[in-house]
UniProtKB/Swiss-Prot annotation:
Cofactor(s) demanded: FAD
Keyword Lipid metabolism: yes
Organism whose genome encodes this protein: Salmonella typhi
Name of the protein described by the UniProt record: Acyl-coenzyme A dehydrogenase
Group of enzyme by EC: oxidoreductase
EC number of the protein: 1.3.8.7, 1.3.8.8
Function: Catalyzes the dehydrogenation of acyl-coenzymes A (acyl-CoAs) to 2-enoyl-CoAs, the first step of the beta-oxidation cycle of fatty acid degradation. Is required for the utilization of medium- and long-chain fatty acids as sole carbon sources for growth. Is needed for bacterial survival during carbone-source starvation.
GO molecular function: flavin adenine dinucleotide binding; long-chain fatty acyl-CoA dehydrogenase activity; medium-chain fatty acyl-CoA dehydrogenase activity
Residue positions of the active site: 497 (proton acceptor)
InterPro entries: Acyl-CoA_dehydrogenase, Acyl-CoA_Oxase/DH_mid-dom, Acyl-CoA_Oxase/DH_mid-dom_sf, AcylCo_DH-like_C, AcylCo_DH/oxidase_C, AcylCoA_DH/ox_N, AcylCoA_DH/ox_N_sf, AcylCoA_DH/oxidase_NM_dom_sf
Length: 814
């Protein structure tokens, strides 16, 4: 009985941690339990004395603080990693949303499913069906990329007339004031037609003068610039990146010095600016330049510090000395992008966005706005491109035949085709879910980094898969190619607004560990403020948090999550239970990693990368489950749901295993392995059978396939190869049963070629009627158009000689 009572006590202790019972109530329960066992004669009643001696100090705050919290507090202050001003502002900026739940070890799935699904207003739907549809029709991507290296003038004029650059600007200033959700839908539709078109529209609606002015501008600045930006009268750009500082924006060498100077014939307070920027989208044609620089005030003319820090200003590009106009040439996707320079240019102090009081506040402004822009523009552009590519590649795989069968039926093709379909579904779920948070007023910095990285990365991988499937069709450039420019341009999205290597290895977990953790950020604040009282309360909440996640990790690993709560009992039930387990695992691994490695975790990028991967996969899986629920839980969509969640579970478990295999403290790694994998690893990548079901969805018209491509431009217009492939798919499917019937009548397995000739012969023999012959002829026309590629006269591929800038000759010393 003694052994059973000990086991029961351990189970009770575990249950208290598992359910996160408060310290005081847990202490009372343990004392009562010990007393009951003593009365029953199983334990000595005198055990209450040592137990009380242990528990009382934990529950008496002054004693607990002096004996435990104060020494820990002193040690914590010593090991707390140093944090630069820019890092602190990045962490302090923005908010935590659903990713915070995932990080805490016990996600509230009911809360996730209660987030309202955005609905398009009549105005927003009309914009998508009208101006956006027309802009897609006007865009000829081959002409844009090969002939013009720019949007045609009539398309530029159309975008300005219909206020495409004003989706984020409020109606009071003449803007459209669209929701984040509809902005995402617009960009997805445009990117399925032309990457240049989507980038051109997306950037002014992301991080730029419009966004910064609305949040921080003075009334005078807003009233002057916002109506002009809304009308397209002003073209904005924002210059942050320098040759010497790409991802490390805090190291920008561009400078401004507060001083007095002459402006329009008068002596005014202003700044002398010097900058050298590159990679600035819209800079070559911009009329107003948003500029980030480090501002100093050596004479303290503003009355504050000498070194004010990063500041943002708006500079009309007509200002004498501002250099714009030259262009970069990014991977044959020539959107307007180029350098800008200025040397010792004097401008009034009122050019600072928000006026002089916002001097030195630029980095906070940028980070707060960047989390919104990064969460919409780049993920939406990548997602829209992959959605269109998924439909087109699926159609091509059905239409294209080798060895008398559609190539889409070959297992070698099914594997990458399933990845394309699965990624399109997952990416759209992830890109949509973050817009829900933004519309609720959140500025999710960590989540925007997750979505930016995974949508652009999966987008690139999906484009590579599509190129493997389409072969020569994807390689040969021309108006009928739906893939090559997306393939060429994929690294652009990977690189901009936080290069993906940096985003994955430093930003996702680097910010997530502090911002998403329920206690660490407040503990750091308490340490910085030398507040032992606040630290004491947080410390014991933190200890309970670690204990809870240790118990939850072990128990959910032992039972494979079978006992954990789920919001549904259908085919997705087990996924919620698996995610409950992984969430507890992540919380435990994060706390132990921070405790063992301390400040060095910041430099252990491969460890933080893997922890960030787990958090990311938890988000992607939950986004898939949220999408499935929002769309009505269609059973036909389950193959995509299974693929998306199983892929995420497998990748998350792999990341944890890799982390434990490489954890520097091997003793701790062994203990963690026992806690997290008590019965070993269990999750598998999507099976061949599931890949087959997913790949099949893309190859025939159906409701699930339509949901994959929802909102894309699929009109079979002259310059829309995706729409023409959709039309061809319908034509070929309509012809297929007629072709099979002819084969049966003739007793031959005829190839699915020369259908027009076959139609004439079959009609002459009375095997088909005129309508069926017309269907076969139409299918042959569409089939040939789909599999053929463009060719050109040799001179059509030549370009004009590029005029290089003259090199300045060095003057030799005498």
């Amino acid at each position: 009985m003694m052994i059973l009572s000990i086991i029961a006590t351990v189970v009770l202790l575990g249950a208290l941690f598992y359910h996160r019972v408060s310290l005081f109530l847990s202490s009372l329960i343990l004392l009562a339990w010990t007393a009951a066992l003593g009365v029953a004669g199983l334990w000595s009643i005198w055990l209450l004395v040592p137990l009380a001696i242990i528990l009382v100090p934990f529950n008496l705050t002054p004693m607990r603080k002096s004996m435990i919290s104060a020494p820990v507090f002193r040690g914590f202050r010593k090991v707390m990693p140093p944090m630069s001003r820019t890092e602190k502002e990045a962490i302090d900026a923005g908010t935590t949303w659903w990713e915070g739940d995932l990080f805490q070890g016990k996600p509230d799935w009911k809360k996730l499913h209660n987030y309202p699904q955005p609905q398009l207003t009549a105005e927003e739907q009309a914009f998508l069906d009208g101006p956006v549809e027309e802009a897609c029709r006007m865009a000829n991507d081959f002409q844009i990329t090969h002939e013009l290296a720019d949007l045609p003038p009539e398309l530029w004029a159309y975008l300005k007339e219909h206020r495409f650059f004003a989706m984020i600007i409020k109606k009071e200033y003449g803007g459209l004031e669209f929701s984040a959700y509809v902005q995402s839908r617009v960009l997805q539709k445009l990117s399925g037609v032309s990457g240049i078109l989507a980038i051109t529209v997306g950037v002014p609606n992301s991080l730029g003068p419009g966004e910064l002015l609305q949040h921080y501008g003075t009334e005078e600045q807003k009233n002057h610039y916002l109506p002009r930006l809304a009308r397209g009268q002003e073209i904005p750009c924002f210059a942050l990146t320098s040759p010497e500082a790409g991802s490390d924006a805090g190291a920008i060498p561009d400078t401004g010095v507060v001083c007095m100077g002459e402006w329009q014939g008068q002596q005014v307070l202003g700044m002398r600016l010097t900058w050298n920027k590159r990679y600035i989208t819209l800079a070559p044609i911009a009329t107003v330049l948003g500029l980030a620089f480090k501002l100093s005030d050596p004479d303290r003319l503003l009355g504050g510090e000498e070194e004010l820090g990063i500041t943002c200003a708006l500079i009309p590009t007509s200002t004498p000395g501002v250099e714009i106009g030259r262009r970069h040439f990014p991977l044959n996707v020539p959107f307007q992008n180029g350098p800008t320079r200025g040397n010792d240019i004097f401008v009034p102090i009122d050019y600072i966005i928000g006026g002089p009081k916002m001097a030195g506040q630029g980095w906070r402004m940028l980070v707060e706005c960047l989390s919104v822009g990064r969460g919409i523009t780049l993920p939406s552009n990548s997602t829209g491109g992959v959605k269109s590519v998924a439909l087109a590649t699926g159609a091509y795989a059905h239409i294209r035949r080798q060895f008398k069968i559609s190539i889409g039926k070959m297992e070698g093709i099914e594997e990458p085709l399933a990845r394309i379909a699965g990624n399109a579904y997952v990416m759209d779920a992830a890109a949509s879910l973050i817009t829900y948070g933004i519309m609720l007023g959140e500025k999710p910095a960590v989540l925007s980094a997750i979505v930016k990285y995974h949508c652009t990365h999966r987008g690139q991988q999906s484009i590579i898969d599509a190129m493997d499937i389409t072969g020569g069709k994807g390689i040969m450039l021309g108006e009928s190619n739906f893939l090559a420019r997306a393939y060429q341009g994929a690294p652009i999205a990977i690189t901009v607004e936080g290069a993906n290597i940096l985003t994955r290895s430093m930003m996702i977990f680097g910010q997530g560990a502090i911002r998403c953790h329920p206690y660490v950020l407040e503990e750091m604040a308490a340490a910085q403020n030398n507040d032992v009282n606040a630290f004491d309360k947080l410390l014991f909440k933190h200890i309970g948090h670690v204990g809870s996640n240790t118990v939850r990790s072990f128990w959910l690993g032992l039972t494979r999550g079978l006992t954990s709560h789920t919001p549904t009992g259908d085919a997705t039930k087990r996924y919620y239970q698996h995610l409950n387990r992984l969430s507890a695992n992540l919380a435990l691994l994060s706390d132990v990693s921070m405790a063992v490695l301390g400040g060095s975790l910041k430099r252990r990028e491969r460890i933080s990368t893997r922890l960030g991967d787990v958090l990311s996969q938890l988000y992607l899986a939950s986004a898939v489950l949220k999408r499935y629920d929002d769309e009505g839980r269609h059973e036909a969509d389950l193959p995509l749901v299974h693929w998306g969640v199983q892929d995420a579970l497998y990748r998350a478990e792999q990341a944890m295993d890799d982390l434990l295999q490489n954890f520097p403290n091997r003793v701790v790694a062994g203990l963690l392995t026992a806690m997290i994998f008590p019965t070993g690893r269990h999750y598998l990548a999507p099976s061949d059978k599931l890949d087959h079901a997913v790949a099949k969805i893309l190859q025939v018209p159906n409701a699930t396939r339509s949901r994959i491509g929802r909102g894309q431009y699929l009109t079979p217009a002259e310059h829309n190869p995706v729409g023409l492939l959709e039309e061809a798919l319908r034509d070929v499917i309509a012809a297929d049963p007629i072709h099979q019937r002819i084969c049966k009548e003739l007793g031959k397995n005829l190839p699915f070629t020369r259908l027009d000739e076959l139609a004439r012969n079959a009609l002459a023999k009375g095997l088909i009627d005129k309508d069926e012959a017309a269907i076969l002829a139409k299918a042959e026309e569409s089939r040939l158009r789909s599999i053929n590629v463009d060719d050109f006269e040799p001179e059509a591929l030549a370009t004009k000689p590029v005029k290089l800038p003259e090199k300045v000759r060095k003057v030799e010393a005498a």
